[in-house]
Amino acid sequence: MRSNRFYLIILALIVLSYLATALIDNQYPFFAGFAILTLVVMALAWNILGGYGGYVNFGSAAFFGLGAYSAIVSYQLFAAPLMIQIFVAGIFCALLGLATGYLTLRLRGVYFAIATLALLVVSETLIHNWDYVGGAAGAYLLPSRTLSLFGLLIVGADGGLFSNNKEFLFFLLCVLVLVTIIICRTIENSKFGRGLAALRDNEEAAESMGVPTLKLKLMATMISAALMGVTGGFFPYYMTFVEPTSAFSLDISVNALAMPLIGGTAYWLGPVLGAVVLGTLQQVATVTISSEINLLIVGLFLVGFVIFAPDGFLGLIKKLRKRGD
């Protein structure tokens, strides 16, 4: 019964996200919403390995950036449409996550964190020096103003389901967020999720009990990397321009790590809550003050929650409920 209600809510949110694109004329809400939803997916994806499995990953921006550049390469090589670009980005980053995980997941603690940070640095350096994708100068991706599928006009100012690409991408990202939530919720309630929790709590004990820890970590890394890559695949199509400094920004890794910790890593709702609250504050700060203070906001929240509420928003709410009882 509870599961049916959950999926009905998901369906209702998909319908609402489409209605929003049809009823709202101002384009800024879609821009701000796109930025916040990107953070939600990144936070959820990070939490699969970092929260459920206990492996702190500083390389989220590497998968995001490589997903963005995978889309650029597929567009330049084959003039691939948006959905193919996103698919290529997800597959490439999943395979890269598998390879990276195999090389690094035998490391633990700070050594694993440093290895993932090194992946970010190496990835950005390679793209900086790859002229085919624009190198340090970046590359443009100019989407068509119309998009049709099986004769149906998806994007078009005259009679399309969406009047422009920004609205279409916002809707697609809403769907991706909801799909990611379903994936994370399924992991939490599965044998896979219980195995990740076991290795997070005590990896040696889990191994001695026969839990296939390496297999679980590789699966978690693949899923996490694929979701980050797919999110990155949206980036050049939405911005129409991508360059290494923004695609591989350390801000992306910091946000992906901090938002689950602030929201709470035990359940999928924690990363969503952390990303929505902090993402909204960042958008408000960008408009009213300056985007330069966005990381300051994240840092202050992170320090405060580490000291006063180490289990995040959800843990704090749970404690307050217990006190009330």
Predicted regions and their residues:
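Transmembrane alpha-helices and adjacent helix-loop boundaries
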Residues: 1-325
